[in-house]
Structure formats: structure tokens, C-alpha cells
């Protein structure tokens, strides 16, 4: 089985300077041959890959990839030469179901075995249509919470034998049970966007903060440093 499908086929092994809400044209977004934002291609035989999943936040939209928390984490761990493998879909309006489906795609690869999974969850009210590459909001909070609980159980089952951590940026503000927000693998639920840009994406201070948090959590849970 190959790596997950990108929704940015047109940029595979290429780049763009305008994407989603970033129409400034000042950042060069490099896409690898798998079609994901990164400065390296992916190898199914890589044993030290830290795989990152999420939304435009994990894709570091608005900033060079080298300022992303994913890149900083891989370069800030000294025990091994870790590589950051980004599987977030740029500025696509992905929902948590899409994010977990991507995690599942990686988990089901027979030859590729990530060292760590880092999962960024997004608003519980999002609904993504892969066929149309578009999304919308669902306004029923009860329905959103019920759907998310099922999705999270799936995530737990997928990664029960793996090294993994997660955090959430849920703009919907839905009250989520403590057994999720206080889960041992939860880094933080709704981290503050201590710097923002392009209307609603976090800036460099946020990425610095999250990289430190992720590194501390990896040390706490798995003695990875």
C-alpha cells in the first residue's frame, strides 16, 4: 500500500506561492513527490518518521515549513535523526473524520512503520466532502459531539499499540468529556493562538510553543528526547 492520496496533485514535486487564505505570494510552499507540504520526499523504509496529521495549522500555512512545529520537533530531538512526515492537506477544509482516515491509511501500510503519530484535531462542527474537496459547518452540537466520540474511539483503537499524542483546535467550543481532554495522550485541548495571521491561522510563536509541548510530551510518555 502506498502513502495516502494528496488533494493537491497539481503541485506534486512542485510548489505554489498562493494557497487557501494566503494570497500574499511571499511564501514558497514546496510539495514533495507524495504531494504534501514538506522539504523532503517520503521513504516507506524510514524507521524514524514522526508523522503529523491535521489541518492548515499543521501544514504551517502562512509560514515557511522550517518554522512549523512539525519541522521543529524533528530537528529538536537528539536521541535519533528523526524526520517529520507531514500528512495534513494544506488548506483543504478537512474534518476530523478525514484526518483519522489518513491516520488509518498510514496504519494500514504493511511496510511503513512510523516512530510516532502526532494528530491535530480540528473543529467538531466541520464536515468535509472529499469528492468535491469542499466543506461546510454543521450547527447541531449534539450531533457533532456524538460523531466525534465515535471518531475518537476509532483513533484510540487504531493507535493503541503505537506511540502517539494528540491535540485539538476546536473553534466550535463544544464541551468535550474530560476523559478525552484529560487523556494521557492529549497534549492540550484548544491551545491559545498566541500569535495569529491571515485572519485565523497561528503564527510563529504558536508553532514554537507547540513544538516545545510536543517534545515534552514525547519525553513524558515514551522517553523520547
Positions of predicted regions on the chain:
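Surface-exposed cleft-lining segments at the edges of enzyme active sites
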Residues: 57-61, 88-92, 134-149, 196-202
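A structural motif corresponding to the C-terminal end of an alpha-helix
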Residues: 77, 150-167
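Serine-esterase "nucleophile elbow" of acetyl-processing enzymes
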Residues: 26-97, 209
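Histidine-centered active-site loop/cap adjacent to the catalytic His
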Residues: 194-225
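N-terminal secretory targeting modules
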Residues: 1-51, 112-115, 121-142, 148, ...
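Active-site regions of enzymes building and remodeling cell-envelope glycoconjugates
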Residues: 162-165, 175-201
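Soluble or luminal CAZymes and related metallo-dependent hydrolases
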Residues: 65, 94-101, 140-154, 202-210
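Short, well-structured alpha-helical segments in soluble
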Residues: 100-112
Amino acid at each position: 500500500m502506498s502513502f495516502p492520496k494528496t488533494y493537491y496533485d497539481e503541485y506534486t514535486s512542485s510548489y505554489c506561492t498562493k494557497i487557501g487564505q494566503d494570497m500574499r505570494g511571499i511564501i514558497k510552499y514546496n510539495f514533495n513527490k507524495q504531494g504534501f507540504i514538506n522539504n523532503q520526499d517520503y521513504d516507506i523504509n524510514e524507521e524514524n518518521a514522526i508523522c503529523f496529521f491535521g489541518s492548515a495549522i499543521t501544514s504551517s500555512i502562512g509560514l515557511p515549513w522550517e518554522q512549523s512545529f512539525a519541522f521543529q520537533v524533528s530537528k529538536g530531538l537528539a536521541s535519533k535523526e528523526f524526520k517529520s512526515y507531514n500528512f495534513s492537506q494544506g488548506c483543504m477544509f478537512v474534518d476530523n473524520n478525514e484526518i483519522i482516515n489518513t491516520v488509518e491509511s498510514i496504519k494500514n501500510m504493511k511496510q511503513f512503520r512510523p516512530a510516532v503519530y502526532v494528530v491535530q484535531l480540528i473543529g467538531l462542527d466541520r464536515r468535509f466532502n472529499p469528492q468535491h474537496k469542499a466543506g461546510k459547518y454543521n450547527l447541531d452540537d449534539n450531533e457533532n459531539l456524538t460523531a466525534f466520540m465515535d471518531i475518537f474511539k476509532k483513533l484510540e483503537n487504531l493507535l493503541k499499540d503505537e506511540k502517539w499524542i494528540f491535540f485539538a483546535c476546536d473553534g466550535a467550543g463544544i464541551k468535550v468529556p474530560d476523559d478525552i481532554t484529560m487523556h494521557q495522550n492529549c497534549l492540550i485541548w484548544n491551545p491559545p493562538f498566541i500569535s495569529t495571521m491571515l485572519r485565523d491561522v497561528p503564527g510563529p510563536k504558536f508553532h514554537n510553543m507547540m513544538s516545545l509541548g510536543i517534545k515534552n510530551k514525547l519525553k513524558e510518555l515514551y522517553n523520547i528526547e
